[in-house]
Curated annotation (Swiss-Prot):
<feature type="binding site">
    <location>
        <position position="162"/>
    </location>
    <ligand>
        <name>Zn(2+) 1</name>
    </ligand>
</feature>
<dbReference type="GO" id="GO:0050897">
    <property type="term" value="F:cobalt ion binding"/>
</dbReference>
<dbReference type="GO" id="GO:0019877">
    <property type="term" value="P:diaminopimelate biosynthetic process"/>
</dbReference>
<comment type="similarity">
    <text>Belongs to the peptidase M20A family. DapE subfamily.</text>
</comment>
<dbReference type="GO" id="GO:0008777">
    <property type="term" value="F:acetylornithine deacetylase activity"/>
</dbReference>
<keyword id="KW-0457">Lysine biosynthesis</keyword>
<comment type="pathway">
    <text>Amino-acid biosynthesis; L-lysine biosynthesis via DAP pathway; LL-2,6-diaminopimelate from (S)-tetrahydrodipicolinate (succinylase route): step 3/3.</text>
</comment>
<dbReference type="GO" id="GO:0006526">
    <property type="term" value="P:L-arginine biosynthetic process"/>
</dbReference>
<keyword id="KW-0378">Hydrolase</keyword>
<dbReference type="InterPro" id="IPR005941">
    <property type="entry name" value="DapE_proteobac"/>
</dbReference>
<dbReference type="InterPro" id="IPR050072">
    <property type="entry name" value="Peptidase_M20A"/>
</dbReference>
<feature type="binding site">
    <location>
        <position position="66"/>
    </location>
    <ligand>
        <name>Zn(2+) 1</name>
    </ligand>
</feature>
<keyword id="KW-0479">Metal-binding</keyword>
<keyword id="KW-0862">Zinc</keyword>
<comment type="subunit">
    <text>Homodimer.</text>
</comment>
<comment type="function">
    <text>Catalyzes the hydrolysis of N-succinyl-L,L-diaminopimelic acid (SDAP), forming succinate and LL-2,6-diaminopimelate (DAP), an intermediate involved in the bacterial biosynthesis of lysine and meso-diaminopimelic acid, an essential component of bacterial cell walls.</text>
</comment>
<feature type="binding site">
    <location>
        <position position="99"/>
    </location>
    <ligand>
        <name>Zn(2+) 1</name>
    </ligand>
</feature>
Amino acid sequence: MSKTLTLAKKLVSIDSITPQDKGCQSIMISHLNDLNFEITDLKFGEVDNFWAIRGQQSPVFVFAGHTDVVPVGNESEWHMPPFSAQVKNGMLYGRGTSDMKGSLAAMLSATDRFVKDHSNHKGSIGYLITSDEEGPAINGTVKVAQYLKKINQTVDYCLVGEPSATHELGDIIKNGRRGSLNGSFKIIGKQGHIAYPHLASNPIHLVIPALNDLCNEVWDEGNEYFPATSFQISNIQSGTGVTNVIPGESNIVFNFRYSTQCTQEQLQSRVCAILDKRNFEYQITWEHSGYPFLTPKGKLVNACVNAIKTVKNINTQLSTSGGTSDGRFIAPILKTRVIELGPSNATIHQVNECVSIQDLEDLSDIYYHILKNILT
């Protein structure tokens, strides 16, 4: 059994449901200690994190990832126990195989091979690992990145091992992500009997024209890297549950996935301007969960594209689609180039999550060639 598969099975067999680590990081740290990495344990609250680095020179190339996984869901729907790390028909099954313990195993085996082949490599190799990516993401990567900034640790390039492939390994590299802005507002009306609307003020009727305005607004037209900013309503709540009462308030929850053409401040201002045009009282709150980031073509992107071409002989595509990742913390806090490159995302967060064993071996090979392209 290969080093990559051995490590993957060890990690997947641990039920590290977010924000628990349960020893996954100890396995990684033990492996990195053998390669003369300097390890810094960084526990914030109940979250385990670590920073590891080998070398003291630039460029600093960092692997970033997480050891926590999402809950398994209905275990009876799994073909095999979700933490048994079983192999069947060339696939490794288990929660976290694709997201993202398979990537962690590939990183470690690639690093081991690279250090043994190039013991005097230039620059430095780092690892930024957390157990708080799938949960609130409060005491994880964001805190580690802030710590690294505080100690003036530079990071020139960062590869996050999130599952990025759509149809085959290496077909997609995420070279950026949209920002995410959550909002919620309450429309204040006046409760009353539904047969006497003149004695009440229906907040649902009041808010519908404003919602139409928000849904029809063109926030921007995107650019060559990002699609147009998206506004989506995720929740509308109102009423008392009976048919004869006009509600006294209505609550709306929404989200922006926004491009680099907008800022959170601009979006907030424009939403309030649209609401202010309407004759109702409202209260609004905001939660910003991630800035957009973009890594343009250059040393890091080229190193990844060329590594994929070497191993898979395919031409990869750059994409900024999808949800947020911890890259949203690393890129702005450490002012660094970030890309995401990992296995298939076809079964992530699903029952019977699995990853191709051949893909894990090829991913390790790709990571090896990325290290070689940047640090030799």
